[in-house]
């Protein structure tokens, strides 16, 4: 049974898998509506273990790389470090204390652990969510408002925001150690067991608390992230259109003449008519350098376009994964707050276990989409762990691609940067 009833996938409690009733003032399991099939515990253990190992490994690597590599201590990476710590905390304090009691049908860790784990679970979920919001706002400022955001995009400001986030989360979740207690009950085999449950004094307070968590940990953060990443995607899309217009304008001003002997109005006609010998010498002297410059420009433009499209796709993945991981558990807890009996009948046992597992998945996908998908972080990882195989030095195309990929998360994708690059670009 879900004996750790107050264990947080999202800072709330989880229904038990059997319907509880009172007999002689003692809680008993009246029935077992969903008898677990033989394969379900094995699958549950396998999936929980896999998510646990991936989360611990991924977040530990992120923390190690960002702490040991001083060159990577940027404003964004400071937020990513805080996110990795909170995700690691979520994994360590949530998964074992949910899986083990679920399998044993008894919370065997005692009252002190019940209060401590529920408190740290709620705090880790809150910090993780607030960090995701802070990262989205920081990226919005860097890309869409680069000039205005320079004032507050400093390491000291990031550290203040992170400290405030942790203090606020610890404060918000103080009801958990106060109202989390062990509740004894009698199982169907007449053995006495315990549940770790978070129970407020009355139904109104319980419903208000769940509604409060639904707002501050899911709906409001989700809306903020959607708006921020939507505006960033719009900015990048406008940049893609700007690049296309610039490329078309450059082709119109600089038509190719290598494959045709006819000359129309333009530089080609002028170069053939005025002082042909000198022009030929100048062309011969300038051809290698100008050809290389044109190739670099073309490669840079292509890499920049591809990098912007990758960022847009990644932002969409971030928003989709946030809602996919957290919507089921928040919906389940809100349902249980307002209709306890119906929710416990339909969600008890295996359904709620896998809903919780889905929420825990966020702790292992965050390091992947925020860090390991970033080329600079991968290079920092290789620099931190020199024992790992290192790829050969990239060619000019790879260097340009790396530079442009890094720029997609900075201020160079702003409107100011587009106009600045356009004004300062050399003429054809």
Curated annotation (Swiss-Prot):
Residues 1-41, 105-115, 179-210, 335-349 are extracellular. It is a multi-pass membrane protein. GO terms for molecular function: cholecystokinin receptor activity. It is found in: Cell membrane. Keywords: Cell membrane, Disulfide bond, G-protein coupled receptor, Glycoprotein, Lipoprotein, Membrane, Palmitate, Receptor, Transducer, Transmembrane, Transmembrane helix. It comes from the Eukaryota. Residues 250-269, 393-428 are annotated as: Disordered. GO terms for cellular component: plasma membrane. InterPro entries: Cholcskin_rcpt, Cholcy_rcpt_A, CholecystokininA_recpt_N, CholecystokininA_recpt_N_sf, GPCR_Rhodpsn, GPCR_Rhodpsn_7TM. Glycans are attached at residues 10, 24, 190. Residues 409-422 have a biased composition (Polar residues). Disulfide bonds join 18-29, 114-196. The chain crosses the membrane at residues 42-67, 78-104, 116-137, 158-178, 211-234, 314-334, 350-373. A lipid is attached at residue 387 (S-palmitoyl cysteine). GO terms for biological process: cellular response to hormone stimulus; G protein-coupled receptor signaling pathway; regulation of hormone secretion. It holds the Pfam family 7tm_1. Belongs to the G-protein coupled receptor 1 family. Receptor for cholecystokinin. Mediates pancreatic growth and enzyme secretion, smooth muscle contraction of the gall bladder and stomach. Has a 1000-fold higher affinity for CCK rather than for gastrin. It modulates feeding and dopamine-induced behavior in the central and peripheral nervous system. This receptor mediates its action by association with G proteins that activate a phosphatidylinositol-calcium second messenger system. This is Cholecystokinin receptor type A. It comes from Canis lupus familiaris (Dog).
């Amino acid at each position: 049974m879900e004996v750790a009833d107050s264990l947080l996938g999202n800072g709330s409690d989880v229904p038990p898998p059997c319907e509880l009733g009172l007999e002689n003032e003692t809680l008993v399991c009246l029935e077992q509506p969903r008898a677990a099939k033989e394969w379900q515990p094995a699958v549950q253990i396998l999936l929980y273990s896999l998510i646990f190992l991936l989360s611990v490994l991924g977040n530990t690597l992120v923390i190690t790389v960002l702490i040991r590599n001083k060159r990577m201590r940027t404003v964004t990476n400071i937020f990513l470090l805080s996110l990795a710590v909170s995700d690691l905390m979520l994994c360590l304090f949530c998964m074992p204390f949910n899986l083990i009691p679920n399998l044993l049908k008894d919370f065997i860790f005692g009252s002190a652990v019940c209060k401590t784990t529920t408190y740290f679970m709620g705090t880790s979920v809150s910090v993780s969510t607030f960090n995701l919001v802070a990262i989205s706002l920081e990226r919005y400022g860097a890309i869409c408002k680069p000039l205005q955001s320079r004032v507050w995009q400093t390491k000291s400001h990031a550290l203040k925001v992170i400290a405030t986030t942790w203090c606020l989360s610890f404060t918000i979740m103080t009801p958990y150690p106060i109202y989390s207690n062990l509740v004894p009950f009698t199982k169907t085999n007449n053995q006495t067991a315990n549940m770790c449950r978070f129970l407020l004094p009355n139904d109104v307070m319980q419903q208000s608390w769940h509604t409060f968590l639904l707002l501050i940990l899911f709906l409001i953060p989700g809306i903020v992230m959607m708006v921020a990443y939507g505006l960033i995607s719009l900015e990048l899309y406008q940049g893609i259109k700007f690049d296309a217009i610039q490329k078309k304008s450059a082709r119109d001003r600089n038509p190719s003449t290598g494959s045709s002997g006819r000359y129309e109005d333009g530089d080609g006609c002028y170069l053939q008519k005025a002082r042909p010998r000198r022009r030929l010498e100048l062309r011969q002297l300038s051809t290698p350098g100008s050809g290389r410059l044109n190739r670099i420009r073309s490669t840079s433009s292509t890499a920049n376009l591809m990098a912007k499209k990758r960022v847009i796709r990644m932002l969409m993945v971030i928003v989709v994964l946030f809602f996919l991981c957290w919507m089921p558990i928040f919906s389940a807890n809100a349902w249980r707050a307002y209709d306890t009996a119906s929710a416990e009948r339909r969600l008890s046992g295996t359904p709620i276990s896998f809903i919780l597992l889905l929420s825990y998945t966020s702790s292992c996908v965050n390091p992947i989409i925020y860090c390991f998908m970033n080329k600079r972080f991968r290079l920092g990882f290789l620099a931190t762990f020199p024992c790992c195989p290192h790829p050969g030095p990239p060619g000019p195309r790879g260097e340009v691609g790396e530079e442009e990929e890094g720029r997609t998360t900075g201020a160079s994708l702003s409107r100011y940067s587009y106009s600045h690059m356009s004004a300062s670009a050399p003429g054809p």
